[in-house]
Amino acid sequence: MDNSFQLDQVIENQTFSGNMLAKEYEACEFNYCNFEGIDLVSIQFINCSFMGCNLTNCKVKNTAFKEVSFTDCKILGVNFSVCNPFLLELVFTRCTLDLCSFYKLKLKGIVINNCSLKNVDFVEANLQDAVFENCDFYGSAFERTNLERADLTTSRNFSLDPELNIIKK
């Protein structure tokens, strides 16, 4: 694959390894691709979608996710707290995000629908105006987390200490 820039591509049923990835993807669709354990360091994804992909244990240091959606993806153990925070915009639908970290990330207005978020680190994250629809937060950590106007009404298994978090309607 070209190692520089991919625009408006549909990439399907690909198993990635080593240096197979371009440095930047814009308006690309990844369908049923396997990125398990892949180093995505410093890659830019702009206005991209991932459908049915496996991103378990990917390394995302300085990776840019700008207007990126994930649907029906398996994303276990990914440390999103080290990705590039500039213009970070993520949407997750029907994904498994267990054991991920969003530590200290600014995710104002993030939308997460019908996802498993077990044992996820949200410590010191800014989740103002976030929408968590029908999500399972079993064992997830919220401490010094900004949850102003966040909607968790249809979600379950979360424990929020109002003394340790910012919670306002």
Feature locations, PLM:
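Tandem repeat scaffolds
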Residues: 1-169
